[in-house]
Amino acid sequence: MHVATDNGSIVGGAGAFQFDLTVPGGSVRTAGVTVVGVLPSHRRRGILREMMRAQLDDIQARGEPLAALWASEASIYRRYGYGLAALCGDMNIPRTHSDFVRPVERKGTVRIVGHDEALTVCPPVYDRVCAETPGMFARTREWWKSRVLDDPEWRRFGGGELSVAVLEDDGRPQAYALYRLNFSYEDGVPTGKVVVLEAMGAEPEAEIAVWRFLLDIDWMASIEAELLPLDHPLLLLAAEPGRLRFRVGDGIFVRLVDVGAALAARSYATDDDLVIGVVDTFCPWNDACFTVRGQKTMEEPDLRLPVDTLGSVYLGGFTFRQLARVGCVEEVSEGALDRADALFRSERAPWCPEIF
């Protein structure tokens, strides 16, 4: 934790904790940047810039190639090299319009479990999803206890208590859902809603089955969920996808603190190689040319881009060509955009299911 003081009083702070972030082909030790702020009385004095400078220097010294955060104001963090790396979506589904476009065979059985049992059965499912989804981060047992399954009154925002449903096949957990039932009635008619905090399936069939369970809960009028992946199966399964009211927003931002190490840590979809010229004025050790495999080079670049743009393509959430269209990438060598997009392609849309 970095803090700024004025005459002995704390006027600003910026925290970070370590986790392993999934990237295409593996995982990377990452600084999860959080609780960043400066008192209103001390704005416009360069305090945030100094804290970001000290924090990124420390992250580099600890050997963490990446930093990631959720941005309350994205324009602030772009100045320090963070790029939008993933999107997410919210849904608000009327239960009367939750039918699937085709029948889905229901596999397994669902059990409601207590939080102590959930601490045993849910993490293995999460870990399987995490291992194949860029943008997710590994959770420790303590994180599960204190952040995911802890359910004090202040976290409920007036809603119901945290419920946990586990879908099992031959006694083995294959999916789970964390949700709240917020009961309400108007003129004796149920108008409540299911608030889905997290739903994961180790296999596509299990994920679909646990969502079908959530959509079929009685006495509820709607199902709400936030922080969903852009490739969510309900977008293709819903008989009336417009009724999902799927709204897209920004997800995590990624900053390559050590460009060479970060590029070397992920895998690529082709055997091609090219040279990327990185512009990084805030972390000058990155201001250089790198091969896609992470080697610094004196060769002329095939592409030239600022480091925040590299953060946007790193997990596969955006393409070089998309960013070139808005002036964020310069194609130096003809055909380099297509080659880079083929290299950085990811099978899954990057997704982070939890704000930290």
Where are these regions (language model features)?
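Intrinsically disordered, low-complexity, positively biased terminal segments
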Residues: 23, 102-356
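Beta-sheet entry/capping signal
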Residues: 1, 8-13, 27-30, 65-68, ...
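N-terminal membrane-targeting/anchoring modules of bacterial envelope and secretion proteins
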Residues: 2, 10, 14, 36-37, ...
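Conserved GNAT acetyl-CoA-binding A-motif
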Residues: 52, 57-71, 218-229
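Conserved acetyl-CoA-binding loop-helix of GNAT-fold acetyltransferases
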Residues: 33-38, 43-60, 203-215
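Conserved beta-strand in the GNAT
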Residues: 3, 9-19, 32, 37, ...
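Conserved active-site alpha-helix within GNAT-family acetyltransferase domains
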Residues: 61-65, 70-91, 209, 230-245
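An N-terminal, globular interaction/scaffold subdomain
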Residues: 14-17, 22-27, 39, 44-45
